[in-house]
Amino acid sequence: STLFPYTTLFRSAVFAKEQQLELVPNEYFITPESKERFEKAKSMDKHGTVGCVALDMNGNLAAGTSTGGMMLKKYGRVGDSPIIGAGTYANNQTCAVSCTGHGEYFIRNAVAFHVHALMLYKKLTLRQSLQFVVDSVLTPQNGTGGLIAVDKKGNVAWYFNTAGMFRASMDSNGIKKIEMYSK
């Protein structure tokens, strides 16, 4: 057991020794299969995020974001996905938001939280809030990415400043919408 439920890779070997965990050489983790996956990902320069937002029948909003990660990233890097307010945010007063893109910009600007704040304090619609954050905060800093969201009334919206963003939605009547490029 530990007092620190959250750590990064920084000093992970020291932490593992303190916890009396078995240590193995780093080469242990390099298999022909993992090396092939790494080389393939490296050549494609692609990564993907899976995000979801939901409104249940009781009016509760939820958001989740699972990152595909950035290959060849600096060790110990923590992206925006696990940081509430940066890459993921939900508040029953307004909306649920999940983000994808260059995480450092989302962290520095608390992007997901600001969608909520714009709706709460400025009374912007969900779509207006998404558009404002992307166009007025991310884009001027050369930050790229997109957001999906649902508001407390069940309105679904998304906005992005990239060539495309895969997304899908389904309403309470089972009507599905799947899109890739158009905003």
Descriptions of predicted regions:
Residues 11, 115, 154:
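Residue-level signal for inorganic ion chemistry
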Residues 46-49, 142-144, 163:
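Short, small/polar residue-rich loop motifs at catalytic or cofactor-binding pockets
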Residues 67-108, 116-122:
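Conserved mixed alpha/beta catalytic, RNA-binding, or beta-rich assembly cores of soluble enzyme
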Residues 2-9:
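Short, small-residue-biased leader/transition segments that mark boundaries at the very start
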Residues 123-153:
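A conserved acidic, glycine/proline-rich C-terminal tail/linker
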Residues 50-55, 61-63, 145-150, 156-158, ...:
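Short beta-strand scaffold segments in enzyme catalytic cores
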Residues 40-74:
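Internal active-site segments that recognize and position negatively charged phosphoryl groups
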Residues 65-69, 159-164:
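Short beta->alpha transition motifs characteristic of CBS
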